[in-house]
Amino acid sequence: MKNFNELSVTSSYKESNLQLVEQKACIVVGIANPRIKIRVEVLLSESPEYQTIYISSGSEIGKLIEEADLIIGSGITAYEGVARRKPVIVVGDYGLGGLVTPDTFRSQYNNRFKGRINGMKDESFSLESLEKEIKKAFSLTFQELQMMSNQIITYQNI
């Protein structure tokens, strides 16, 4: 997973020229609600440090999540992201649920990753608050992501 705060650069040798290629953080967005999706698109379109991919069909969820550095979405997209040890920001029909962390995992899971806990349908949220969550997402450790993934497996087997 790429660190948002660090510039990740790779080099390649091509025709006697050394080329530096900036690696952007890949954010996969899986939001069904069109109004909420537009709000997220507005923020991410203004952020050149991200490569953003929007899920358009259920059949591509797994492949895109594997390639992602961060998932923004709700429902099955968020669930799959956590299961595959990716940082997930829950944004759905019930607003901004925020970054899924070991402290918030159980309540988000019980809320089916639909948005803010006890949120209202079509609840609004500020783009600034989403931006803060994106920056926090890249500080989760592999151990934290693994722990939440293991919890999903445990809950499935109950």
Question: Over which residues does each language-model region extend?
Answer:
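Nucleotide-activated donor-binding/catalytic signature segment of Leloir-type glycosyltransferases, i.e.
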Residues: 41-56
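An anion/phosphate-binding loop that grips the pyrophosphate of nucleotide cofactors and donors
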Residues: 68
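Catalytic binding pocket for nucleotide-activated donors in carbohydrate/polymer assembly enzymes
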Residues: 77-142
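A short, well-ordered alpha-helix in the C-terminal region of glycosyltransferases
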Residues: 136-157
